[in-house]
């Protein structure tokens, strides 16, 4: 039985999927902890409390009554970060990051995050060319968004064995960035990715990125920058217009996950294919 105050923005399958108590089964602390962990991982409840009491009945004196009380958290969160940077090339200026999160955007614990960042720097006389302050200022503006599902969303990853003991997430990410460097260049970049993070045991974690795309393009350059690139072909390669698809897999084995140990051992393996490798396969 589910009792709630209307309106409630929660899909019908969310609670049954994350509550591991079943009528007629033997009660265990592990089941209670698993239920609390599942509900807490959704990120939509401020508090989750489980109360277990014996039934006041002579007929079913061997049974327990389980009551779960959950309080919804505020779905929207906003953050603002401000900073000031001073660099060795005499550039100084402020930076600002504004972020907003919706912790239950589709009613199933999905988290939508949007972050806007910007910075502006100007050059003081101490490090400027010919002892004069630069007439051109350095700035950077970026917009990044991500959508996180607290479960595996069917797609590029094969169907995993059904398990609710460990967390699993699917993330979609999109971003764009504009960078201006005085006396050198103005460059724009775009990126997008899809990734899966899940655990198959208490110690083994997996991160699969079947698709990631990065695109960079120089909008304009100065004569000084072009001359430097001609003199340094190796550096010039990193500034060419690039369209880079990639895929990656990371396996992490952590002996301390879920418990306290004196000696912690972490082993991580990562494999990635990008650029020319993918081009060779398609050709």
Question: Model-derived features: where do they sit?
Answer:
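Secondary-structure boundary/capping residues
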Residues: 24, 48, 109-110, 156, ...
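Transmembrane beta-strand segments that form the barrel wall of outer-membrane beta-barrel proteins
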Residues: 19, 52, 76-88, 96-98, ...
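Transmembrane beta-barrel architecture of outer membranes
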Residues: 16, 34, 63-65, 77-79, ...
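Composition- and surface-driven signal marking solvent-exposed, interaction-prone regions
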Residues: 31-33, 50-53, 67-68, 80-83, ...
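Periplasmic polypeptide-binding modules associated with outer-membrane biogenesis and secretion
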Residues: 1-86, 99, 117, 122, ...
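Transmembrane beta-strand segments of outer-membrane beta-barrel domains in Gram-negative
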Residues: 1, 7-10, 127-283
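Secondary-structure transition/capping motifs at alpha-helix termini
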Residues: 41-46, 70-76, 102-111, 154, ...
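Short glycine/serine/proline-enriched coil/turn segments at secondary-structure junctions
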Residues: 57-60, 87-91, 106-108, 182-184, ...
């Amino acid at each position: 039985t589910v009792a709630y105050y209307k309106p409630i923005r929660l899909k019908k399958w969310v609670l049954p999927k994350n509550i591991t108590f079943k009528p007629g089964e033997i009660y265990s602390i592990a089941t209670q902890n698993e239920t609390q962990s599942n509900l807490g991982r959704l990120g939509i409840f401020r508090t989750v409390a489980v109360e277990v009491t014996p039934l006041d009945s002579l007929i079913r004196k061997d049974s327990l009554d389980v009551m779960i009380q959950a309080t919804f958290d505020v779905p929207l969160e906003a953050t603002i970060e401000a900073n000031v940077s001073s660099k060795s090339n005499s550039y100084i200026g402020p930076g600002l990051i504004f972020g907003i999160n919706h912790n239950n955007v589709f009613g199933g614990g999905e988290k939508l995050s949007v972050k806007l960042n910007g910075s502006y720097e100007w050059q003081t006389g101490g490090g400027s060319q010919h002892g004069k302050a630069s007439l051109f200022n350095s700035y950077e503006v970026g917009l990044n968004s991500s959508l996180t599902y607290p479960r595996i969303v069917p797609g590029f990853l094969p169907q995993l064995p059904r398990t609710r003991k460990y967390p699993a997430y699917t993330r979609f990410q999109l971003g764009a960035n504009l960078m201006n460097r005085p006396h050198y260049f103005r460059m724009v970049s775009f990126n997008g990715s899809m990734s899966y993070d899940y655990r198959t045991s208490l110690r083994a974690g997996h991160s699969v990125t079947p698709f990631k795309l990065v695109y960079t393009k120089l909008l304009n350059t100065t004569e000084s920058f072009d001359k430097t690139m001609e003199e340094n072909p190796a550096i010039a390669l990193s500034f060419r217009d690039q369209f880079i698809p990639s895929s990656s897999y990371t396996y992490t084995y952590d002996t301390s996950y879920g418990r306290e140990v004196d000696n912690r051992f972490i082993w991580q393996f990562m494999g990635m294919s990008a650029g020319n490798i993918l081009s060779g396969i398609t050709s």
